[in-house]
Swiss-Prot record:
Origin species: Maridesulfovibrio salexigens (strain ATCC 14822 / DSM 2638 / NCIMB 8403 / VKM B-1763) (Desulfovibrio salexigens)
Lineage: Bacteria, Pseudomonadati, Thermodesulfobacteriota, Desulfovibrionia, Desulfovibrionales
The name this protein goes by in its record: Large ribosomal subunit protein uL15
Taxonomy, superkingdom: Bacteria
Presence of the UniProt keyword Ribosomal protein in the record: yes
Keywords recorded for this protein, A-Z: Ribonucleoprotein, Ribosomal protein, RNA-binding, rRNA-binding
Description of how the protein assembles with itself and partners: Part of the 50S ribosomal subunit.
GO molecular function terms noted in the UniProt entry: rRNA binding; structural constituent of ribosome
Length: 148
């Protein structure tokens, strides 16, 4: 037995449709493209968004809103996630968070308050939610907010 003899058998494989090979095949002559017109030409046809000349949907609907170029997006990390990744540590810097792969390097980090803080710990991040700050300080630690 050779590789080319293994399943699927030749009879089970569907032959591709060969067009333009005589009228007896059922796909001769115009090869299923009809007579003349844009769709009969090579490379012919209209793009998927073309609506036949009527005013396109994107132009019928009004413009709305804008994109703020100065928007800052923060990666949200819960206190529980951070402490779970750094068990036994008392100081967790932003660089540590990046190195551990909790978020991409250079991302703005906001710490949220879901999870338990049992020991005093110092955490560095760009922002802290009120609940996160409360939990960290209640356990005797500090929430160090960075600039930028």
């Amino acid at each position: 037995m050779r590789l080319h003899e293994i399943y699927p058998f030749q009879e089970e494989r569907k032959n591709r449709k060969r067009v333009g090979r005589g009228g007896g095949s059922g796909w001769g002559g115009t090869s299923g493209k009809g007579h003349k017109g844009q769709n009969a030409r090579s490379g012919g046809g209209v793009p998927a968004w073309f609506e036949g000349g009527q005013m396109p949907l994107a132009r019928r609907l009004p413009k709305r809103g804008f994109k703020n170029p100065f928007r800052e997006e923060y990666v949200a990390l819960n206190v529980g996630q951070i402490l779970g990744a750094f068990e036994g540590r008392t100081e967790i810097s932003l660089e540590d968070i990046y190195e551990r792969g909790l978020c991409k390097k250079g991302a703005l980090v906001k710490v949220l308050g879901m999870g338990e803080v049992s020991a005093a710990v110092t955490i560095e991040a760009h922002r802290f939610s009120a609940s996160a700050t409360e939990k960290i300080t209640k356990a005797g630690g500090t929430a160090k907010a960075l600039e930028g």
